[in-house]
């Protein structure tokens, strides 16, 4: 028994629960950081250049807002940033006050559903952006147009980094959802 009368088993169980809750808060923080950085990198994706196509000089200009897919990525990131910030603030508050992060099964189901919703939102945004980025990188094969990224490499690098962070944010949300399932599976 410990000094306050608790058995070693109870103390170990409480310590494991505290570690799980700390991991949940860390996952929320990671998701917030990845989503916010993805949005910031995408918002700074802009470049101008000159392409040489069969001896003709064409001025190319690109901005993230020219593509509806990239607009969708920015919108999905903005929503995920707000959701992650709310969950992070709630988690930190509950850690500081010593209350459980998911006090009820209803709240655990609500967190699970919300995590899944934003998880799929980020996956669909990343997939939509990846399709456009792949087209920019490879060019249009059945026409003589070269790939876009030779001329505007900085723009393409910004977009690729942003999409990588979007998929990282998806992994954080999926992991957070997994931890919520662990909470739901314990009696």
Swiss-Prot record:
InterPro entries: CASP/CASPL, CASP_dom. It is found in: Cell membrane. The chain crosses the membrane at residues 25-45, 72-92, 108-128, 163-183. Residues 1-24, 93-107, 184-187 are cytoplasmic. It is a multi-pass membrane protein. Residues 46-71, 129-162 are extracellular. Belongs to the Casparian strip membrane proteins (CASP) family. Homodimer and heterodimers. This is CASP-like protein 3A2.
């Amino acid at each position: 028994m410990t000094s306050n009368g608790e058995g070693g088993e109870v103390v170990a169980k409480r310590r494991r629960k505290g570690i799980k809750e700390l991991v949940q808060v860390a996952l929320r923080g990671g998701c917030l950081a990845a989503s916010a950085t993805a949005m910031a990198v995408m918002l700074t994706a802009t470049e101008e250049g000159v392409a040489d196509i069969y001896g003709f000089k064409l001025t190319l200009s690109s901005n993230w807002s020219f593509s509806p897919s990239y607009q969708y990525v920015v919108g999905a990131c903005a929503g995920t940033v707000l959701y992650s910030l709310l969950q992070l603030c709630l988690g930190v508050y509950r850690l500081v006050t010593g209350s459980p992060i998911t006090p009820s099964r209803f709240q655990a189901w609500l967190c699970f559903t919300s995590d899944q919703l934003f998880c799929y939102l980020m996956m669909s945004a990343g997939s939509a952006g990846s399709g456009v980025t792949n087209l920019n990188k490879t060019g249009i094969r059945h026409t003589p147009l070269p790939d876009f990224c030779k001329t505007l490499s900085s723009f393409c690098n910004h977009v690729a980094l942003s999409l990588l962070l979007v998929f990282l944010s998806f992994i954080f949300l999926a992991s957070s959802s997994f931890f919520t399932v662990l909470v739901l599976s314990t009696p």
